[in-house]
């Protein structure tokens, strides 16, 4: 079984790329803050020029899948993605 660990910076990049694609802007224009809440779970807030959108866990995972597909060149459909907080937020990906 192949395994991969995505760092917090990888997760931020994933949301930046996903949000930029969705909003038709450059990734450099997107600011991202990751979050975790006991009730809401993992998420992110992505902002462009002060206009912010919240990503729930499902949308966050979708952004990570796109990152795996487009940036890492791996098939994300069959990947198991587990978010965790160690020293920072990470994603453990396995196929």
What residues fall within each predicted segment?
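Protein-protein interaction and targeting regions used for scaffolding, dimerization, and localization
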Residues: 1-95
């Amino acid at each position: 079984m192949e395994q991969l660990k995505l760092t917090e910076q990888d997760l931020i990049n994933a949301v930046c790329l996903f949000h930029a694609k969705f909003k038709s802007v450059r990734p450099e224009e997107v600011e991202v803050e990751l979050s975790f809440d006991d009730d809401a779970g993992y998420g992110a807030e992505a902002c462009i020029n002060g206009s912010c959108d919240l990503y729930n866990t499902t949308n966050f995972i979708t952004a990570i899948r796109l990152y795996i597909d487009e940036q890492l060149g791996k098939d994300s459909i069959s990947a198991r993605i587990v978010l965790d907080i160690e020293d920072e937020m990470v994603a453990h990906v396995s196929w």
